């Protein structure tokens, strides 16, 4: 234990404060109350994004003091973004993430971490906005020529990003037959946070999540699932997690807080979803909503 303490002392800033927010709690379904899947980890004044679904930059802005929030930063401070997998509900905000902070004055390149296909997506977005980028740089707008660029880092099973504030480890989860789909274990000096990503029950997730302070896990409505046609039931059972399965997972991991997010409601309410999971798990459960501060 003493050895571990000194190891953490040299790795992390032990005076750091970690804040965790839900930016977007939604799914592919166009729910006007829920943005595309995205989360924010703040360590001191450094933001780290997990996924970037539709509305990511605007929801990020909603947490800043400029727009009535409590964070003394702005969108130009976004430097690192990590992607769990390439599905559209997790990536539709990428063009916003590349372009908008630059328009607002960002000069440093974005650090994109994700499956190798993300690199091609980002290149294609920049190509698609070539006219707008050239107009802003070479027209009368006093715009810099660097802030829309990005550096790419490929994520794989076991990938680790680490600096003096944070350690992020990627692990392969079980999202149907999608080979490059990951969950993340994020460790700071004061928190261990696990993001399930989109997944059916995953033994690797359970192994990686031991000792987690916060487990952010996807789930679907039990009642809604029973109303689905057999073909959709087969699909969702292979790609996602039921309340009973999540209860079993949480009972094994025993996180200090279980956050239900990326919820396939299928007509259920937030309280009904919480009750469905609470039938199988009696720990601290919170239902994610956009701009929720988890910690």
Q: Each predicted region: which residue ranges?
A:
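Sec-dependent signal peptide recognition
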Residues: 1-7
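Hydrophobic h-region of N-terminal signal peptides that target proteins for export
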Residues: 7-16
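Cap/insert and terminal regions of metallo-dependent hydrolase folds
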Residues: 12, 183, 189-192, 200-292
